[in-house]
């Protein structure tokens, strides 16, 4: 019986463990090695799950990007012996998550898991299954204004401007499509 929620064993998203703080270096090195060893058709994408945090520094608000999973990097790849070897032997990579040692192949992430991570990062825009138009009231589901309801005042490609009422003032907020949902009547 086949589980349709699983990505094919040969191709999928895998989690590699790295030394904490070396995630960006591992990503750069892995992409370089994929090109160098003609493995770009096997090592397809490398992502570091991050989120943007607003924090106050010296009395000023600043946006800082933080790793969601320090010490881990996501790799979309065709799992061949050669691709496994290139990834596993990249400097600062300590191994694959879901591998049981002795060169055993790791288990890929479930499709829904990777979609949730990528949507959260803004790398994949979830499908909007309702009409989006100027004047429509929607609910914000992601970001600092999550939970607020507001009308759409402008549409520019995949970006929306909503006018959020805060403290009696109309505040324009720019969002991506994946950050809103329809308000059910």
Swiss-Prot record:
The keyword Repeat does not apply. The keyword Transcription applies. Residues 134-164 form the KOW domain. GO terms for cellular component: cytosol. Keywords: Transcription, Transcription antitermination, Transcription regulation, Transcription termination. Pfam families: KOW (PF00467), NusG (PF02357). SUPFAM superfamilies: N-utilization substance G protein NusG, N-terminal domain, Translation proteins SH3-like domain. One of its GO terms (biological process) is transcription antitermination. InterPro entries: KOW (IPR005824), NGN (IPR047050), NGN-like_dom (IPR006645), NGN_dom_sf (IPR036735), NusG-like (IPR043425), Rib_uL2_dom2 (IPR014722), Transcrpt_antiterm_NusG (IPR001062), Transcrpt_antiterm_NusG_bac_CS (IPR015869). Participates in transcription elongation, termination and antitermination. PANTHER family: RHO-INTERACTING TRANSCRIPTION TERMINATION FACTOR NUSG, TRANSCRIPTION TERMINATION_ANTITERMINATION PROTEIN NUSG. Belongs to the NusG family. This is Transcription termination/antitermination protein NusG.
């Amino acid at each position: 019986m086949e589980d349709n929620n699983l990505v094919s064993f040969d191709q999928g998203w895998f989690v590699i463990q790295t030394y904490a703080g070396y995630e960006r270096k591992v990503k750069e090195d892995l992409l370089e090695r994929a090109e160098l060893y003609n493995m770009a058709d096997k090592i397809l994408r490398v992502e570091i799950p991050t989120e943007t945090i607003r924090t106050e520094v010296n009395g000023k608000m600043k946006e800082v990007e933080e790793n969601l999973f320090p010490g881990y990097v996501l790799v979309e790849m065709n799992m061949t012996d050669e691709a496994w070897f290139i990834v596993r032997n990249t400097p600062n990579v300590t191994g694959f998550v879901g591998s049981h040692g002795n060169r055993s192949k790791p288990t890929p992430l479930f499709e829904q898991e990777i979609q949730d991570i990528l949507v959260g990062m803004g790398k994949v825009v979830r499908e909007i299954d309702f009409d989006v138009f100027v004047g429509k009231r929607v609910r914000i589901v992601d970001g600092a204004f999550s939970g607020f309801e507001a009308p759409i005042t402008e549409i520019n490609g995949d970006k929306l401007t909503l006018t959020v009422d805060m403290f009696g003032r109309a505040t324009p907020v720019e969002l991506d499509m994946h950050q809103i949902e329809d308000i059910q009547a």
